[in-house]
């Protein structure tokens, strides 16, 4: 071979080798998973001294908890939203109230850590152990950085099971940083299924992505639990409730009971309009009548005395947001029921604004305790379920009262366009929306 071509060939071979090496390197690098570990301080975010990151279920929270020694405190709003809505903040008395089926418990707030309730910078926090008294949850506390993961859903949970040891990554793809390693047999909570990667959450607070080939098929899982939930018992009638309201506007009007019911058939409950709020201290007016109750019982009718909030000058929000006022209403209602022999109480608080929702529910919980102590049926009147009345929280009502009543006759009214009073499509909203069907009364 001509000597003058040898250097050229050598250079060409070298270029080819470099190109091949580059291609091989590119291919290898493309398909070799990254071993880079995610910076957990970056993942959970910055925290001030004394703060702890929160992962609630499959959601990494922006809000922080507090930690003091081995005590962890959770923000009340997080507890109410995700874990247990029955912790009620009584701001006037600086205490948390918790209504069980049989008693109203309280825990005073402190400006220092150590007790069940800690108020810091005007924000209310609950000790984790206090939350666990009444709430079914699993808590996983980890350091570096300080974080707590809480699992609270244990029925019909979508899960996948790890088939072989692998990693959960920050994003979908083998080049994404590793959050944590998981072993074969680990059950992960499935957030979203994708083509090649699934978004999953570990019980101890990592939310990321796993190679779909490394997990089994999605399934519904029920986790075994030993926590004993508080159980409400209900005072219900053996037969279907057929109730009428009886508008009674004065003490003298009670005398017209016989005339009002003379031709009435098929009814087993009558609810006279006997009580209403008179001021924001919780005082009520009463025109209840023992003679009326006696006549009703002779006709085979139960009497559920009705209390309303129709007095324009009395703020329902101001009244129900006061623990003293709520207790005042309740004590007067119970006393009146005992005095005249009523069988139950019907609450007809209407046009409730969103800001009174929490206080209204607390009122029902507290009233339920006293009603059941005195063998009184508790029922509550509600508008047909719609988005703008969601704060009535009929599901929670159904857990604590005996009967949830839906006023289905308000589809059209004075001032609205003409139409049916209670059409079938309108009434169907009731049955689709309400979980308390055996104790649901609709009109």
For each feature predicted by the language model, list its residue ranges.
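Primary recognition of N-terminal secretory signal peptides and signal-anchoring hydrophobic helices
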Residues: 2-194, 223-236
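A mature extracytoplasmic/lumenal domain signature
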Residues: 78-80, 93, 102, 130, ...
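Short, solvent-exposed loop/turn elements at domain surfaces
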Residues: 169-170, 199, 250-256, 278-281
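SH3/SH3-like beta-barrel fold
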Residues: 185, 198-202, 210
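Boundary/entry segment of secreted carbohydrate-active catalytic domains
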Residues: 212-258
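Chitinase-like catalytic core of GlcNAc-active glycosidases
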Residues: 238-248, 264, 276-424
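Single conserved hydrophobic/aromatic residue that forms the stacking wall/gate
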Residues: 431-443
């Amino acid at each position: 071979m001509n000597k003058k071509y040898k250097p050229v060939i050598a250079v060409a071979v070298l270029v080819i080798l470099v190109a091949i090496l580059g291609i091989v390197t590119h291919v290898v690098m493309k398909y070799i998973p990254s071993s880079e570990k995610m910076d957990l301080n970056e993942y959970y975010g910055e925290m001030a001294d004394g703060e702890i990151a929160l992962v609630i279920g499959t959601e990494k929270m922006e809000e922080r908890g507090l930690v003091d020694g081995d005590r962890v405190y959770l923000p009340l709003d997080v507890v109410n939203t995700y874990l247990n809505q029955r912790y009620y903040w009584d701001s006037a008395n600086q205490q948390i109230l918790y209504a069980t089926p049989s008693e109203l418990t309280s825990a005073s707030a402190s400006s220092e850590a150590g007790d069940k309730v800690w108020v810091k910078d005007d924000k209310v926090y609950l000790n984790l152990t206090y939350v666990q008294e009444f709430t079914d949850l699993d808590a996983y506390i980890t350091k570096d950085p300080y974080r707590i993961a809480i699992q609270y859903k244990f029925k019909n949970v979508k899960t996948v099971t790890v088939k072989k040891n692998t990693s959960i990554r920050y994003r979908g793809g083998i080049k994404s940083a590793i959050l944590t390693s998981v072993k074969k047999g680990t059950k992960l909570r499935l957030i979203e299924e994708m083509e090649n990667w699934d978004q999953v959450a570990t019980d101890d607070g990592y939310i990321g992505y796993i190679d779909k080939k490394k997990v089994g098929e999605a399934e519904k899982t029920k986790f075994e639990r030993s926590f004993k939930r508080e159980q409400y018992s209900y005072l219900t009638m053996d037969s279907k409730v057929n109730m009428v309201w009886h508008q009674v506007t004065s003490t003298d009007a009670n005398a017209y009971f016989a005339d009002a019911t003379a031709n009435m058939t098929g009814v087993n409950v009558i609810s006279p309009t006997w009580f209403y709020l008179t001021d924001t201290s919780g005082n009520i007016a009463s025109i209840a009548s023992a003679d009326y109750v006696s006549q009703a019982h002779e006709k085979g009718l139960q009497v559920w005395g009705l209390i309303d909030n129709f007095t324009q000058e009395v703020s329902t929000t101001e009244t129900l947001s006061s623990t003293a006022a709520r207790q005042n209403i309740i004590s007067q209602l119970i006393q009146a029921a005992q005095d005249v022999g009523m069988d139950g109480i019907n609450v007809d608080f209407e046009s409730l604004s969103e800001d009174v929702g929490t206080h209204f529910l607390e009122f029902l919980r507290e009233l339920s305790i006293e009603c059941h102590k005195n063998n009184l049926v508790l029922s509550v009147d509600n508008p047909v379920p719609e988005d703008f009345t969601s704060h009535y929280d009929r599901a929670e009502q159904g857990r604590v009262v005996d009967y949830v009543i839906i006023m289905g006759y308000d589809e059209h009214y004075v001032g609205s366009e003409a139409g049916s009073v209670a059409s079938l499509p309108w009434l169907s909203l009731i049955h689709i929306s309400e979980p308390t069907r055996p104790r649901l009364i609709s009109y």
